Amino acid sequence: MSATINPVVDNSVFTDCKVADLSLADWGRKEIAIAETEMPGLMALREQYADKKPLAGARIAGSLHMTIQTAVLIETLVALGAEVRWASCNIFSTQDHAAAAIAARNIPVFAYKGESLEEYWDYAHQIFEWASDGSHTANMILDDGGDATLLLILGSKAERDPSVIANPTNEEEQVLFASIRSRLASHPGWYSRNLAAIRGVTEETTTGVHRLYEMEKKGELPFPAINVNDSVTKSKFDNLYGCRESLVDGIKRATDVMIAGKIAVVCGYGDVGKGCAQSLRGLGATVWITEIDPICALQAAMEGYRVVTMDDACDKADIFVTATGNLRVITHDHMLKMKDQSIICNIGHFDSEIDIASVQKYQWENIKPQVDHVIFPTGRRIIVLAQGRLVNLGCATGHPSFVMSSSFTNQVLAQIELWQNGKDYQKKVYVLPKRLDEMVARLHLGKLGVKLTELTDEQAHYLNLDKNGPYKPEMYRY
């Protein structure tokens, strides 16, 4: 049977959505069709599982960037039997034509580019609103950054102890805590009811995974979680090769700057930082790295990068990129010392890496959406991209379809695993087994014309391996 979902002819009565413009649906559908040709992993899963419907009965609350590639993920989940409600995990990352195309298929989606923080948290609640009478709730979470998971857990804590939302430390927490207080007043017990129904969560990104491990360490993880980020076919491909292409796409769309000849500082030399450094060097920039980890710092030095501190670099470089997952990596003092027209941006999940709040007191001049001048009293200006949020999604369209197919194939397999076998898992964080990692890679080889060498029986015996894998031990680093 065909894995293609039949289009909805008349969606004029469908109102369970919030998108910028439904008239963009045809445009979105055309781009989705192109993306499908570049996402062999997801399309293979549709063909393999469409008849079996392994996600039948699953009601997935999805919080992940609402892009064209995510539309292919959503429709794959639906093809495999799931019901889905979706919101973006970033206020700037939605592609409005992608959201419209999903809404046109009568799939509830709540996302548009340029949401306010109030809308963002309202939409995060909406993905759990399965039935107005409370007869149905979400039973799975697909998360990116951990906000959907955090919302239910923090809200449940606040039902027992309102003091946990009494002292916000930043603007985002102010809005989140106010949203929770409002829901506590209007829907008593809503958070704990929804939390109790969740079988598990699959988490996409480094920052969200860090949150999950922290909860596990404290004994506060309420359900099993699968760490999709640390699948090799996610972290070593999406984080590295995806960022290698999408970082400079965002910078150049936003600024039209010539990168060749500039000094660019990449803060953080993990998988994301490695991809960013490669792309900037490839376009002719002199790349400097900042790092806290001696191993990563040594890797950077051995690749020929100069490893410095932000204090060393802030008054010398032209472009600054944060890729750490930390907070206040670029401080107020750093920005005050930067050269006129220096460009600063972030490619980590949250907007905490650049201390944007500290420069709100200065004059801001909007150049175009997600591109601003901050004008200091001296008259010097710096260019801030996407208000310190994800530059590749705020100023461009994120990673290419092919590399997202690898990540999202892991997500689908993780959802199937938790939905079908969740009772076998404890309230811990797990990683998909090596055999599935290798399966994801295999599904993408044909598109690139790759031919694998097959072990002979003699070779397999010599290496003590199954001819069909897995080929590496779990601790192998790649």
Curated annotation (Swiss-Prot):
Cofactor(s) recorded in Swiss-Prot or TrEMBL: NAD(+)
Disulfide feature: none
Molecular function GO labels: adenosylhomocysteinase activity
Residues that coordinate or bind substrate: T67, D144, E204, K234, D238
SMART domains recorded: AdoHcyase, AdoHcyase_NAD
InterPro entries noted in UniProt: Adenosylhomocyst_ase-like_sf, Adenosylhomocysteinase-like, Ado_hCys_hydrolase_NAD-bd, NAD(P)-bd_dom_sf, S-Ado-L-homoCys_hydrolase_CS
Any GO CC annotation of this UniProt entry: cytosol
Involved pathway(s): Amino-acid biosynthesis; L-homocysteine biosynthesis; L-homocysteine from S-adenosyl-L-homocysteine: step 1/1
Annotated CDD domains: SAHH
Alphabetized UniProt keyword annotations: Cytoplasm, Hydrolase, NAD, One-carbon metabolism
Compartments in which it is found: Cytoplasm
Enzyme Commission number(s) of this protein: 3.13.2.1
Pfam families for the chain: AdoHcyase (PF05221), AdoHcyase_NAD (PF00670)
Domain of life: Bacteria
Known catalytic reactions: S-adenosyl-L-homocysteine + H2O = L-homocysteine + adenosine
Sites where the protein binds NAD(+): 205-207, 239, 268-273, 291, 326, 347-349, 392
Function: May play a key role in the regulation of the intracellular concentration of adenosylhomocysteine.
Name by which UniProt lists this protein: Adenosylhomocysteinase
UniProt source species: Nitrosomonas europaea (strain ATCC 19718 / CIP 103999 / KCTC 2705 / NBRC 14298)
